[in-house]
Amino acid sequence: MSNLMEVIKSRRSTRAFKSELPPKDQIMQIVEAAEWAPSGMGKYLWHFTVIYNAEKSLKLARAVAEADNRGPQYNFYGAPVNIIISYKRDEHHALVDGAAAMENLLLMATELGLVSCWINQLRETCDVPEVRALLTEYGVPEDHIVVCSAAIGYIEKETPAKPRHEGLVSITE
């Protein structure tokens, strides 16, 4: 087993991916890690939708770009895989549960030698009719909202670590 702190410190948000698809078994390991995240009150009302097809991912990115006025160049950074975390609509813990699952997902991708980028635009556009139609076609349940998604793949261009801020911790004894 790897050193967890090393994995945490080496994780980056990558915005330049190679077009090569990672092995499907690695993607399923990533999803399994997400499934093991904690969930408020043990509800586990999330759903993971894997878009293991660069063309379909690009089609969704184009719909998001149109809905969010991002321009024609928006493409989920060219990642060949996109994993969507959705949650039952109107559930109190959806955002924090989804965030916990996403962190597990991102760390497992790093552990497996893949890179990732957390993407929020689907949360903001999931109910735009053109976007919702694709989400439904790809397997996101109708009664779910998108919490977040992750672009997954191999790195095209190295991403240096950003400096961390100081003074963000208070300890009371």
Residue ranges and their predicted role:
Residues 1-173:
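Acidic, surface-exposed loops and disordered segments
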